[in-house]
Amino acid sequence: MNRISLINKEHLISIINFLNDNSDEFNYFKNIGWNIKNIESQFSKDNNYSLGYFEDKNLVGVLIGDTIKNGKEYDLELHILFVSKDERRKKIATKLLNYIETNNLNFSKIFIEVAEDNVGAINFYQKNNFVFSNFRHNYYRYNDKNIHAKCFIKNINNE
Protein backbone atom coordinates (compact mmCIF):
# COMPACT_ATOMS: atom_id res chain seq x y z
CA MET A 1 0.00 0.00 0.00
CA ASN A 2 1.32 3.45 -0.94
CA ARG A 3 1.06 6.38 1.43
CA ILE A 4 2.42 9.85 2.08
CA SER A 5 3.07 10.98 5.62
CA LEU A 6 4.94 13.62 7.56
CA ILE A 7 8.44 12.56 8.49
CA ASN A 8 10.52 13.96 11.32
CA LYS A 9 13.61 13.18 13.39
CA GLU A 10 11.97 9.95 14.59
CA HIS A 11 12.31 8.72 10.98
CA LEU A 12 15.96 9.78 10.71
CA ILE A 13 17.40 6.25 10.59
CA SER A 14 15.01 5.31 7.76
CA ILE A 15 15.84 8.53 5.90
CA ILE A 16 19.60 8.04 6.24
CA ASN A 17 19.31 4.39 5.15
CA PHE A 18 17.19 5.49 2.16
CA LEU A 19 19.76 8.10 1.13
CA ASN A 20 22.68 5.71 1.64
CA ASP A 21 20.90 3.06 -0.44
CA ASN A 22 20.60 5.68 -3.19
CA SER A 23 24.01 7.26 -2.67
CA ASP A 24 25.00 7.35 -6.35
CA GLU A 25 21.92 9.34 -7.27
CA PHE A 26 22.01 11.41 -4.07
CA ASN A 27 25.58 12.57 -4.84
CA TYR A 28 24.17 15.58 -6.68
CA PHE A 29 22.66 16.87 -3.43
CA LYS A 30 25.87 16.08 -1.55
CA ASN A 31 27.80 18.15 -4.08
CA ILE A 32 25.64 21.18 -3.35
CA GLY A 33 25.91 20.82 0.42
CA TRP A 34 23.31 18.29 1.58
CA ASN A 35 25.35 15.63 3.33
CA ILE A 36 23.99 13.32 6.04
CA LYS A 37 25.04 15.74 8.80
CA ASN A 38 23.01 18.53 7.13
CA ILE A 39 20.02 16.20 6.83
CA GLU A 40 20.26 15.36 10.54
CA SER A 41 20.45 19.06 11.37
CA GLN A 42 17.43 19.79 9.15
CA PHE A 43 15.29 17.33 11.06
CA SER A 44 16.19 19.00 14.37
CA LYS A 45 14.82 22.37 13.25
CA ASP A 46 11.46 23.53 14.59
CA ASN A 47 10.39 24.73 11.15
CA ASN A 48 11.24 21.48 9.34
CA TYR A 49 8.42 20.29 7.08
CA SER A 50 9.15 17.00 5.39
CA LEU A 51 7.15 14.26 3.74
CA GLY A 52 7.93 10.66 2.94
CA TYR A 53 6.42 8.52 0.21
CA PHE A 54 6.17 4.91 1.32
CA GLU A 55 5.48 1.80 -0.74
CA ASP A 56 4.38 -0.72 1.82
CA LYS A 57 6.77 0.21 4.63
CA ASN A 58 9.66 1.20 2.37
CA LEU A 59 10.62 4.85 2.00
CA VAL A 60 11.01 5.56 -1.74
CA GLY A 61 10.73 9.36 -1.90
CA VAL A 62 11.30 12.41 0.29
CA LEU A 63 10.36 16.06 0.24
CA ILE A 64 12.40 18.12 2.70
CA GLY A 65 11.81 21.78 3.43
CA ASP A 66 11.28 24.61 5.89
CA THR A 67 8.13 26.47 6.81
CA ILE A 68 8.50 30.24 6.71
CA LYS A 69 5.98 32.50 8.47
CA ASN A 70 4.42 34.97 6.04
CA GLY A 71 1.86 37.09 7.87
CA LYS A 72 -1.01 34.79 8.84
CA GLU A 73 0.09 32.12 6.39
CA TYR A 74 3.16 30.02 5.82
CA ASP A 75 5.35 29.46 2.81
CA LEU A 76 7.39 26.34 2.16
CA GLU A 77 11.01 26.58 1.13
CA LEU A 78 11.71 23.28 -0.58
CA HIS A 79 15.27 22.00 -0.16
CA ILE A 80 15.15 18.44 -1.47
CA LEU A 81 12.68 16.48 -3.56
CA PHE A 82 14.20 13.07 -4.20
CA VAL A 83 12.85 9.73 -5.40
CA SER A 84 14.86 6.52 -5.57
CA LYS A 85 16.07 5.68 -9.06
CA ASP A 86 14.00 2.49 -9.29
CA GLU A 87 10.80 4.39 -8.47
CA ARG A 88 11.18 7.33 -10.86
CA ARG A 89 8.70 8.00 -13.65
CA LYS A 90 5.84 6.92 -11.38
CA LYS A 91 4.80 10.50 -10.51
CA ILE A 92 5.92 10.11 -6.89
CA ALA A 93 7.55 13.57 -6.80
CA THR A 94 4.38 15.08 -8.27
CA LYS A 95 2.28 13.26 -5.66
CA LEU A 96 4.45 14.69 -2.88
CA LEU A 97 3.96 18.22 -4.24
CA ASN A 98 0.23 17.66 -4.71
CA TYR A 99 -0.06 16.45 -1.12
CA ILE A 100 1.03 19.90 0.04
CA GLU A 101 -1.65 21.58 -2.02
CA THR A 102 -4.47 19.27 -1.00
CA ASN A 103 -3.60 18.80 2.67
CA ASN A 104 -2.03 22.04 3.90
CA LEU A 105 -4.23 25.05 3.41
CA ASN A 106 -1.87 27.28 5.41
CA PHE A 107 0.86 27.25 2.75
CA SER A 108 0.49 30.11 0.32
CA LYS A 109 3.63 29.52 -1.77
CA ILE A 110 6.36 26.98 -2.37
CA PHE A 111 9.86 28.24 -3.17
CA ILE A 112 12.67 26.21 -4.72
CA GLU A 113 16.21 26.97 -5.90
CA VAL A 114 17.59 24.77 -8.67
CA ALA A 115 21.07 24.75 -10.16
CA GLU A 116 20.77 26.16 -13.65
CA ASP A 117 22.49 23.10 -15.12
CA ASN A 118 19.88 20.74 -13.60
CA VAL A 119 17.64 20.83 -16.67
CA GLY A 120 15.60 17.79 -15.62
CA ALA A 121 14.60 19.42 -12.33
CA ILE A 122 13.86 22.76 -14.00
CA ASN A 123 11.58 21.04 -16.52
CA PHE A 124 9.87 19.09 -13.72
CA TYR A 125 9.10 22.20 -11.67
CA GLN A 126 7.87 24.15 -14.68
CA LYS A 127 5.62 21.23 -15.64
CA ASN A 128 4.22 21.40 -12.10
CA ASN A 129 3.32 25.10 -12.43
CA PHE A 130 6.33 26.64 -10.74
CA VAL A 131 7.20 30.03 -12.21
CA PHE A 132 10.73 31.40 -12.57
CA SER A 133 11.27 34.37 -10.25
CA ASN A 134 14.99 35.25 -10.24
CA PHE A 135 18.60 34.09 -10.38
CA ARG A 136 21.00 33.71 -7.49
CA HIS A 137 24.37 34.23 -9.07
CA ASN A 138 27.17 31.82 -8.13
CA TYR A 139 24.88 30.22 -5.55
CA TYR A 140 26.27 26.71 -5.86
CA ARG A 141 29.85 25.56 -6.18
CA TYR A 142 30.72 22.06 -7.30
CA ASN A 143 33.22 20.44 -9.63
CA ASP A 144 35.38 23.54 -9.10
CA LYS A 145 32.95 25.89 -10.78
CA ASN A 146 30.26 28.31 -9.71
CA ILE A 147 26.71 27.58 -10.78
CA HIS A 148 23.81 30.02 -10.72
CA ALA A 149 20.56 29.01 -9.05
CA LYS A 150 17.24 29.53 -10.77
CA CYS A 151 14.55 30.37 -8.23
CA PHE A 152 10.97 29.26 -8.77
CA ILE A 153 7.71 29.97 -6.95
CA LYS A 154 4.42 28.16 -7.00
CA ASN A 155 1.40 29.98 -5.60
CA ILE A 156 -0.96 27.64 -3.80
CA ASN A 157 -3.61 29.88 -2.29
CA ASN A 158 -4.58 32.60 -4.75
CA GLU A 159 -7.07 34.31 -2.47
Give the label of every model feature segment.
Residues 2-4:
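Extreme N-terminal starter segment of soluble prokaryotic enzymes
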Residues 6-12, 16-88, 97-99, 103, ...:
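Acetyl-CoA-dependent GNAT
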Residues 70, 136-138:
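Short, Lys/Arg-rich nucleic-acid/phosphate-binding segment
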Residues 84-98, 115-123, 127-128:
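Conserved glycine-rich acetyl-CoA-binding loop
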Residues 103-114:
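Conserved GNAT acetyl-CoA-binding A-motif
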Residues 115-119, 138-159:
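C-terminal "cap" of GNAT-fold acetyltransferases
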Residues 126-136:
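Conserved acetyl-CoA-binding loop of GNAT-fold acetyltransferases
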